[in-house]
Curated annotation (Swiss-Prot):
SUPFAM superfamilies: Glutamine synthetase/guanido kinase. It catalyses: L-arginyl-[protein] + ATP = N(omega)-phospho-L-arginyl-[protein] + ADP + H(+). This is Protein-arginine kinase. One of its GO terms (molecular function) is protein kinase activity. Gene3D superfamilies: Glutamine synthetase/guanido kinase, catalytic domain. The lineage of its organism: Bacteria, Bacillati, Bacillota, Clostridia, Eubacteriales. PROSITE patterns: PHOSPHAGEN_KINASE, PHOSPHAGEN_KINASE_C. The gene is mcsB. Keywords: Allosteric enzyme, ATP-binding, Kinase, Nucleotide-binding, Transferase.
Length: 356
């Protein structure tokens, strides 16, 4: 898939819902931060050095000796994309919102299957990312590690024998790794246990963020849980620790769902079928309301209360209902009210042929 096809298509591999534990853990992501030796960190980069970094990355991904490790990678300057297309890459979790700032000096590298993306000149010179469906942190790390090794055949990284990889933010020094899972926790929220679980997570040295990272809301009861510390731990230790905690949260969410269904079956079923009815027939829907309804419906699908609704479709719709993709589909700028009408119509059309 070319970059142009990527921004015209809401689907991405992590949405396939075919990974382990994907009924609750939507996706796993591993990202490493790397900087080039002898070049100032991005917050000090001038235009000349920004272009130097982009040129170095372009050469690295073209290195035929590293082709088996890298796979097919394509680099594009963010300046080549429209504001809508840049935002769609954010909505698909392929780049961060921060990459959009001062975008003329930045670039993105994508693998054809969208499993791998590399942000160039974000907070660090390179941020190499792999995102996979379900709980697949080890597999995502294997992919990132191979790409990192391939790039290092050409690039000279800023590295200290004493502390490890050097990064713009001190919290990333060491392995430079951030591992995270996107997890759906409506059961804990309905059982009023969510705050306690999130507080416990923070005490374990992990951080909890919203759907699109730091400073964003947990739309649709979706949370990103990631490690905070990279110094003094190996990559394997970071991965194994997060897997262990993710499984504990998974078990708590499953228990909350079982208890809710046992004690408040009619209430849960009512939420699920009300959500389905609203999504199938509503004429006006804001993105926030749609995400809330998707959460209730997703809960019903995962608990086998309702059938015939692919989770993959719900994952895709999380991107399709965002303002950027709606504007792109409409082919013109819309007012917020017009977007809400368009969004409701889009969802009705998607639901019209479901065997429900």
């Amino acid at each position: 898939m070319t970059l142009r096809e990527t921004v015209n298509n809401a689907h991405s591999h992590w949405m396939d819902a075919d990974g382990p534990e994907s009924e609750i853990i939507i996706s796993s992501r591993v990202r490493v931060a790397r900087n080039l030796a002898g070049i100032p960190f991005p917050h000090l980069l001038n235009k000349e050095n920004s272009e130097k970094v982009i040129h170095a990355v372009r050469l690295a991904i073209s290195n035929k000796e590293a082709s088996e490790l890298l796979g097919g990678l394509e680099l594009s300057s963010l300046g080549e994309l429209s504001p809508l297309e840049r935002q769609i890459l954010v909505d698909k979790h392929l780049i961060s919102p921060d990459l959009l700032n001062d975008f003329q000096r930045k670039a993105v590298v994508l693998r054809e299957d969208e499993v791998v993306s590399i942000m160039v000149n974000e907070e660090d010179h390179l941020r190499i990312q792999c995102i996979l469906p379900g709980l697949q942190l080890k597999e995502a790390w294997d992919v990132v590690n191979r790409v990192d090794d391939g790039l290092e055949k050409t690039l000279d990284y800023a590295f200290s024998e004493k502390v490890g990889y050097l990064t713009s933010c001190p919290t990333n020094v060491g392995t430079g790794m951030r591992a995270s899972v996107m997890i759906h926790l409506p059961g804990l929220k309905l059982a009023k246990q969510l705050a306690g679980v999130l507080n416990a997570i923070n005490k374990l040295g992990l951080t909890v963020r919203g759907l699109y990272g730091e400073g964003t809301e947990a739309l649709g009861d979706l949370f990103q849980i990631s490690n905070q510390i990279t110094l003094g731990q190996s990559e394997e230790e970071i991965i194994n620790n997060l897997i262990s905690i993710a499984r504990q949260i998974l078990a708590q969410e499953q228990a909350a769902r079982r208890n809710l269904y046992k004690d408040r079956r009619e209430v849960i079923e009512d939420r699920v079928f009300r959500a389905f009815g609203a999504l199938k027939y509503a004429r006006i829907l804001s993105s926030e309301e749609a995400m809330r309804l998707f959460s209730d419906l997703r809960l019903g699908v995962e608990m086998k209360i309702i059938s015939g609704i692919p989770v993959r479709l719900l994952n895709e719709l999380m991107v399709k209902i965002r303002p950027a993709f709606i504007t792109k589909m409409a082919g013109r700028e819309l007012t917020p009210y017009q977007r809400d009408i368009f969004r409701a119509g889009l969802i009705r059309r998607e639901f019209a042929n479901l065997p429900v």
